[in-house]
């Protein structure tokens, strides 16, 4: 099981802790959206409003999409508000184009 912690506005609106049976971190958003309808839509809205989120897996900030492919069965995933201009990729860039 993977512990998923939301932070910031998402935590206030959807709760801060989820325990999910996921093996691939790329399934995180869809798993939360199945339990909390509108979650992905809200994440997209926040991203468009200039409030992107960063992805931290097992205490490591993900800065490139290829890093996710090597992280199977994560123990903990945190979705945290990104600091604007903080790097080359944000959660939206990683996940929002995955179908």
Region roles according to the model:
Residues 1-16:
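Eukaryote-biased recognition of intrinsically disordered, low-complexity regulatory segments
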Residues 7, 36, 62-64:
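Alpha-helix initiation/capping motif
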């Amino acid at each position: 099981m993977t512990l998923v912690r939301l932070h910031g506005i998402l935590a206030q609106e959807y709760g801060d802790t989820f325990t999910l049976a996921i093996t691939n971190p790329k399934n995180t958003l869809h798993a939360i959206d199945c339990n909390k309808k509108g979650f992905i839509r809200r994440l997209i809205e926040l991203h468009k409003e200039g409030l992107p989120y960063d992805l931290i897996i097992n205490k490591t900030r993900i800065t490139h999409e290829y890093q996710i492919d090597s992280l199977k069965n994560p123990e903990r995933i945190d979705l945290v508000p990104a600091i604007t201009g903080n790097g080359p990729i944000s959660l939206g860039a990683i996940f929002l184009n995955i179908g």
